[in-house]
Amino acid sequence: MLNLQAKLNEKKVPLLTNFPTPTSSLNNLNLFSLPLVKKKMSFKKMMKYILKTIFKPIFMACGCGSTVPPSSHSHYTPGPPVSPTVLRSPCPKIDESVAMAKESINPFEDYKKSMNQMIEERYIETESELKELLRCFLDINPSPQHNLIVRAFVDVCSHLQPPHDRRGKSLGRLLRLYVNNPLDNNDDDSHQTSSK
């Protein structure tokens, strides 16, 4: 059993998505186990603390092998485990990928890391394969996350050498499409970059 856990911890799994998901419910939370800095904590502060410990950013990991379960936290009881999702795609390089929920502090960087890993592990090179990768990210995420995913995709693609598919269409046209026409603007406050 320990060897299996060690192998799972060594296995790097690309990230695929990020969206907030409750990891526990108020019914399961033991209010007496909350650390109180002062003898009396106002109800408003206590509820704010409870909400911080209940809701954690979650992202999905995707790969063709085993996935690593999210790290445990001692200050809350996790909810039921999230079952993996097998992605179906007409692109053979993405078909049969497995998406699994994971925790994320910086979703923008995690999206980029996941996309880079998928591109590297699955040898994604052509414009059509990159479009399919983006479609998979968008399909398994709620629409408020789409703008962040597209930004991460554009950032990843801007660092790739411009590949050409068999028809000679460059990726530049695809990038201009998403840069000039963002999908939505309601997640500007959730966009985190490494330059901040």
UniProtKB/Swiss-Prot annotation:
Location(s) in or outside the cell: Nucleus
Repressor as UniProt keyword: yes
Main localization of the protein described in the UniProt heading: nucleus
BP GO annotations: negative regulation of DNA-templated transcription
Keyword terms: Nucleus, Repressor, Transcription, Transcription regulation
Expressing tissues: Expressed in roots, cauline leaves, shoots, stems, flower buds and siliques.
Domain OVATE as annotated: residue spans: 100-159
Signal peptide: none
InterPro entries per UniProt: Ovate, Ovate_C
Keyword Endoplasmic reticulum among UniProt keywords: no
Chain coiled-coil ranges: none
GO cellular component: nucleus
Phenotype of gene-disrupted mutants: No visible phenotype under normal growth conditions.
Note: Plants over-expressing OFP10 have no visible phenotype.
Function: Transcriptional repressor that may regulate multiple aspects of plant growth and development through the regulation of BEL1-LIKE (BLH) and KNOX TALE (KNAT) homeodomain transcription factors.
Name by which UniProt lists this protein: Transcription repressor OFP10
Source species: Arabidopsis thaliana (Mouse-ear cress)
